[in-house]
Amino acid sequence: METVQLRNNPRRHLKKLSEESLNKQPEEVFDVLEKLGEGSYGSVYKASHKETSQIVAIKQIPVESDLQEIIKEISIMQQCDSPHVVKYYGSYFKNTDLWIVMEFCGGGSVSDIIRLRKQTLNEDEIATILQSTLKGLEYLHFMRKIHRDIKAGNILLSCEGTAKLADFGVAGQLTDTMAKRNTVIGTPFWMAPEVIQEIGYNCVADIWSLGITAIEMAEGKPPYAEIHPMRAIFMIPSNPPPTFRKPELWSKDFVDFINLCLVKNPELRSSATELLQHPFIKAAKGESILRHLLNAAQDEKLKRTELKQREVEPEEKENVNEDEVDVGTMVQAGGKDLNTMKELGMMSEGADGTMVEKDKLETQMGTMLINDEDEEEETGTMKQCTEPAQQAKPSFLEYFEQKENQFGTPEKTSPTSTDPSEWKIPLNGDYSFLKDWSVAEVQLKLNSLDPMMEREIEEIHHKYQAKRQPILEAIESKKRRQQNF
C-alpha cells in the first residue's frame, strides 16, 4: 500500500528546489505519475522528484487564470515554514502553464476521508486533528496571516496523520497589528458573523470557522447545510451560535470547546493559542490513532478505483483519470454550482488546490470570494463607506443578484400564471384553484417562488441598511474626532 511505502522510504526529503533544478525543464526534475483532479485555477498532479524519489503535488495553472490570486497564494506559501502548513517547493513556467510544486499529503483531506468511509469521526480523532490544525493556525496568526477558508476540505493529512492547512487561494495578511479586513471571503456555511456583516475582522474569524469545522467532522456537514446559502448568510449573524444537533451525545469538554470557538463577539472569542490549552485539546491522543482512518480510506479508494476500471471499456481506459471521482473530490464537468462566487472548495490528496465533489451538498459549499477592484483590502486597513445609504449593498447580495440575472426566472406562458409578483396569496387560504392547473403550471409556479423570495429578502435588507448606515457613519465620525484630539 502506498502509505506504507512512503513511511518506509529511506531517501532524503526535499526541502526546496535548487536554483539548478529551477533552471531545468520540469519534466527533467519530476516524473508526473497521475492526475489528482481539478483544483482552484488549474489541474493538480501527483509527481515524483527524480533526485530524492519524494512524492510531490504539482498544480498546473493556465496563464490566463487569475494571476493576482495565484501570486498571492504562492506568496503566502513561500513565507510559511511549519509542519502544520503545506510546504511550497518552487515554481516553473512551461509553455502556457505555471507549475507550482508543493507538498503532497497522501492521506487526502478530512472531508475526503469522511466521504470515502461514509462515517463521521469520533471525539479522539477530532481532537487529534484539531490539535494539529490549531498549531497551524497559531503559526499563521503569529505571522499575521488569516487563512479565511478553514473547513474539513482544506485540512489535509499526511501519511503519518499530521494535519496540515492548505489552499491559500483566499488567504490574506494583516500588515498592521490593529488592521481588520472587511471583504466577504470564505465559504458561506463556515463564515464568521463579522465576515458576513462586513464590519471588519481579524485572525479570530478563522476560529469561528474551526468551530464549524469541528461540527462538520462530528456530524458530517456544517450547520445550515440543508438550506440555501443566501438564507444561511442572513441567519448566521442574527441567530444564536450553532451547536450540535444532539449535544447530549458529546462530552462536556467537546461541547465547551465548540462554544468557545463560536462566540459571536470576536473580541470575546478565544485565540488559537488559548484553545491549545483547552482540556479537550490537551487530552488529544497521538497521530497514530488516525492511521486506521487513513488505511480504511485508502482501501475504499482502491476498491472504487478497481470497480471503476472494470466498468470501463478498454478503449475508454485512457479517460479514467478524468472521470474518476474517488481519487479526490473532483470538479464536475458542467457543474451546477449556482451558489458560489469562486469555487475553491474541497481539497484532495495533498494537492494544495481545491477539489469539489459532485454531490448535491458540495455544490452549495464552495468558497465565496469577493474583492474590491483595487484590492485595497490588502493594505489591511478598514475601508470607509462613503456611498449614500440607498446604494449600500453587501457584496454577497450583489453576487446572488448576478446569479439570478444569469439563470433568469421562468418564461411566461400566460399573462398571469407564471409571474410570482402577480400571484396574490388567497386571503381565505383557499388553494382549490390549483386543482385546475396542469402539473407543468404548478411546477413552474413553484420554481418562480425562490427568486421572488430573494427579491423580498433583498428589499428588507435595503430597508435595514438604510437605517443602519447613518448610525455607522455617526460612529465613524466620533472615532475620527477622538483621533484628532
Curated annotation (Swiss-Prot):
UniProt keyword annotation of ATP-binding present: yes
Entry annotation: catalytic residues: 149 (proton acceptor)
The protein's required cofactors: Mg(2+)
Residues the record lists as Phosphothreonine modifications: 183
Domain Protein kinase: 30-281
Site (Cleavage): residue numbering on this chain: 326-327
Purpose: Stress-activated, pro-apoptotic kinase which, following caspase-cleavage, enters the nucleus and induces chromatin condensation followed by internucleosomal DNA fragmentation. Key component of the Hippo signaling pathway which plays a pivotal role in organ size control and tumor suppression by restricting proliferation and promoting apoptosis.
Family stated for the protein in its record: Belongs to the protein kinase superfamily. STE Ser/Thr protein kinase family. STE20 subfamily.
Complex formation: Homodimer; mediated via the coiled-coil region.
Protein name per Swiss-Prot or TrEMBL: Serine/threonine-protein kinase 4
Organism of origin: Xenopus laevis (African clawed frog)
Gene expressing this chain: stk4
